[in-house]
């Protein structure tokens, strides 16, 4: 019996089996690129007003005038980045046909772990090489000075688009390096050329945490993106499915379910498109004729599991210990969490970091969404912030299970 089974298993290499299916099997997806969040469609549905407002705000740059600083708000998946990138793309096409010294610079603040890295990203897109702007080693003030000089000497009209600018504000708060304030005052130091800031934020309350001086300069104009309705998401999905899948491959009920699931999450079109993509990939792997509701439900589970697991595994050791301390403390204050963290360090033989540093890590983990904090009132003792996990403890245990240092305390 075992010999027969072994022979059956070795009849065909498992890699070849998968590649044969990919090469010769059924394919329901004909253009995967259209299901990526980076894809910019020619038509962005239900965002005509927002496109007009952002374009009006940025269009003075084509007349060699400085556009007003702009803040773009809206929850994730409401089309903010898509609209801004489309407009930048169209402006760039016109710039190429002229001799205007215009630079459109885009960066996502969350992709950079330090303020230095963020400023270097701006510099590279302005054309500064490693000699002119080293990847490390300069003071923040010197990096900023070199950015201003590049704009000034090139007589450049520059637009810095900062996606997830709320994360930059968090970095500023953490390092006490007021880069946002310096960026908003940069034009006072630029004799030739100009700098405009476009900030994109998922956090509608973000500006309430800004220094009033920064807010005044940064929000010269504002555009708010409302949530998509379920019907609007359905129309977006129909459009993408028609281009990305072979005709008739996606059932109407599957599209409805994708739209309904995304609609429950504040109208997140990005999640809806991601669901459709993963559901399509699962249908192909199963050699199915098309995408069904079952594929969509399976895709939703897979996306959630992968997202949380990957994020948890990526944390450094001491942030993992802080997360475990929150899990063990169950809704406790920073002081109680720090006490548990110290005990976990003792059990794992790790050097204990200061309470200030541990509290900072707790704030970083909260920002990433793995824990949530809530202010509670405690009578004469005033207010305190209580923290709890936003993911199931079982997910944490699974993600940290391969870490040999943590194995004995999970």
Curated annotation (Swiss-Prot):
An MF annotation (GO) of this entry: ATP binding
Pfam entry (one): Cdc6_lid
Superkingdom of the source species: Archaea
InterPro entries referenced in this protein's UniProt entry, alphabetically: AAA+_ATPase (IPR003593), AAA_22 (IPR049945), Cdc6_C (IPR015163), Cdc6_lid (IPR055237), ORC1/CDC6 (IPR050311), Orc1/Cdc6_arc (IPR014277), P-loop_NTPase (IPR027417), WH-like_DNA-bd_sf (IPR036388)
Keywords in alphabetical order: ATP-binding, DNA replication, Nucleotide-binding
Binding annotation for ATP: 78-82, 228, 240
Signal peptide stretch: none
Keyword ATP-binding annotated: yes
SUPFAM superfamilies referenced in this protein's UniProt entry, alphabetically: P-loop containing nucleoside triphosphate hydrolases, Winged helix' DNA-binding domain
GO biological process: DNA replication
Family listed: Belongs to the CDC6/cdc18 family.
Entry-linked NCBIfam families: orc1/cdc6 family replication initiation protein
Job description of the protein: Involved in regulation of DNA replication.
Designated name of the protein: ORC1-type DNA replication protein
């Amino acid at each position: 019996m075992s010999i027969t089974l072994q022979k059956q298993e070795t009849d065909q290499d498992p890699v070849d089996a998968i590649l044969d299916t990919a090469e010769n099997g059924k394919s329901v997806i004909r253009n995967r690129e259209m299901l990526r969040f980076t894809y910019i469609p020619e038509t962005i549905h239900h965002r005509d007003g927002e496109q007009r407002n952002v374009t009006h705000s940025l269009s003075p740059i084509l007349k060699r005038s400085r556009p007003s600083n702009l803040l773009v708000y809206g929850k994730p998946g409401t089309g903010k980045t898509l609209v801004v990138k489309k407009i930048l793309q169209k402006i760039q096409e016109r710039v190429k046909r002229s001799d205007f010294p215009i630079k459109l610079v885009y960066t996502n603040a969350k992709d950079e772990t330090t303020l230095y890295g963020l400023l270097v990203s701006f510099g590279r897109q302005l054309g500064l090489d490693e000699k002119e702007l080293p990847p490390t080693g300069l003071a923040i003030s010197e990096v900023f000075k070199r950015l201003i000089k590049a704009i000034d000497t090139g007589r450049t009209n520059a637009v810095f688009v900062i996606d997830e600018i709320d994360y930059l504000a968090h970095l500023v708060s953490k390092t006490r390096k007021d880069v946002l304030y310096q960026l908003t005052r940069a034009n006072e130091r630029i004799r030739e050329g100009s700098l405009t800031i476009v900030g994109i934020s998922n956090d509608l309350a973000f500006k309430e945490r800004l220094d009033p001086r920064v807010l005044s300069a940064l929000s010269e104009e504002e555009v708010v993106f409302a949530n998509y309705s379920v019907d609007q998401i359905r129309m977006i999905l129909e459009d993408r499915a028609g281009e990305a899948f072979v005709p008739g491959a996606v059932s109407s009920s599957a599209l409805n379910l994708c739209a309904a699931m995304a609609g429950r999450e504040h109208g997140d079109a990005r999640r809806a498109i991601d669901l459709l993509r993963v559901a399509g990939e699962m249908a192909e792997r199963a050699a199915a004729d098309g995408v069904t509701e079952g594929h969509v439900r399976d895709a939703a589970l897979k996306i959630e599991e992968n997202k949380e697991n990957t994020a948890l595994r990526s944390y450094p050791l001491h942030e993992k210990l802080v997360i475990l301390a929150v899990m063990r403390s169950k809704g406790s204050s920073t002081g109680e969490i720090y006490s548990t963290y110290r005990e976990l360090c003792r059990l794992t033989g790790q050097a204990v970091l200061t309470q200030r540093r541990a509290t900072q890590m707790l704030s970083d983990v909260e920002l990433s969404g793995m824990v949530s904090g809530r202010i509670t009132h405690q009578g004469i003792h005033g207010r305190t912030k209580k923290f709890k996990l936003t993911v199931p403890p079982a997910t944490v245990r699974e993600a940290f299970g391969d870490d040999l240092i943590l194995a004995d305390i999970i």
